[in-house]
């Protein structure tokens, strides 16, 4: 992961509501994909980058494809890919057997929480300093 991307993403998890911690630091979101095949897409709501971790051992490999670059990555159990999901059109190919992956990402709109707690800064009804 690039240091500047890490710095941007980690500022979000450093100020989670109620001083909570993220189990997927420096990301704030986690998706569990079970037997998922996707159409070609970009993720416009993601912040900077996403990380994909393959956690199954399916027949053959998991093929992650990128339209703009023409790259087809044959991923196996334990492989990790980090890429800018807002900029690269991507999809995963059809497969046989079972396929499971974890996708780590952060929502780009989390920057509003960094700026002013989504408009709640100074509100007595929301204590961002206390743990629940």
Mark where each language-model region is.
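Catalytic core of Fe(II)/2-oxoglutarate
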Residues: 46-48, 57-132
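Conserved, ordered domain cores of eukaryotic regulatory proteins
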Residues: 1-46
């Amino acid at each position: 992961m690039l240091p500047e991307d890490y710095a941007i993403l980690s500022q979000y998890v450093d100020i989670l509501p109620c001083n909570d911690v993220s189990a997927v630091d420096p990301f704030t979101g986690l998706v569990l994909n079970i037997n998922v095949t996707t159409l070609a897409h970009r993720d416009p709501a993601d912040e900077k980058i996403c990380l994909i971790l393959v956690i199954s051992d399916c027949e053959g490999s998991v093929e992650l494809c990128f339209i703009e670059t023409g790259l087809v990555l044959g991923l196996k159990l334990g492989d990790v890919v980090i890429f800018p999901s807002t900029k690269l059109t991507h999809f995963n190919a059809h497969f046989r057997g079972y396929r499971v992956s974890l996708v780590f990402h952060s929502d780009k709109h989390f920057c509003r929480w960094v700026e002013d707690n989504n408009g709640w800064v100074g509100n007595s009804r929301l204590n961002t300093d206390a743990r629940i």
